[in-house]
Amino acid sequence: MKKRSDFEENVSNSKLGQIKDIVIDTIISHNRGTSVIKGHKDQPLENFRINNVQMFMHTEDSKDKRATDALVIENVNGLKINDLTVKWDEKEPEAKWKSALVLKNVSDFEIRSFSGRQGLKNGNHPAISLDTVSEGLICESRAEAGCSTFIQMKEKEKSGLTLRNNNVTKAKNDISYV
């Protein structure tokens, strides 16, 4: 019979697997928590596509409320988002709600036809938060009414971000850098 330490040794010597060529298509979701898509920092997800997705964020019914952002995507190379809409419950908003979309450590990405705002109407968080991203395009997207900042970026110098044909007339600020 093998000991637990035998399994742990095998795991530590194993190579990381690769996950690539993923498609999420035509989804309507009613969420009560943050949705997370996360690759490994040493082996990011590759070639990830999200098409025609509507997310409706609702108040959590548990006592231990953890939802912050609607969708967090982390450690991805080659991300394409086409037609993503995020709506927040305005009747019973959660105090911890922040951004509609968060990208962390994402390279070679394209966001086309995004529509949304931050979680709390007239709150201080951005609709789209970008942290350690590179070679990206955000185009033909729209800030919804009550949007504070449409896009917030960290690491301005390294990003290679292109913005094109976005409708930010309903946002107080189109982009900010922190």
Task: Kindly give the residue locations of the regions a language model identified.
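Extracellular/periplasmic carbohydrate-active domains that bind, remodel
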Residues: 1-178
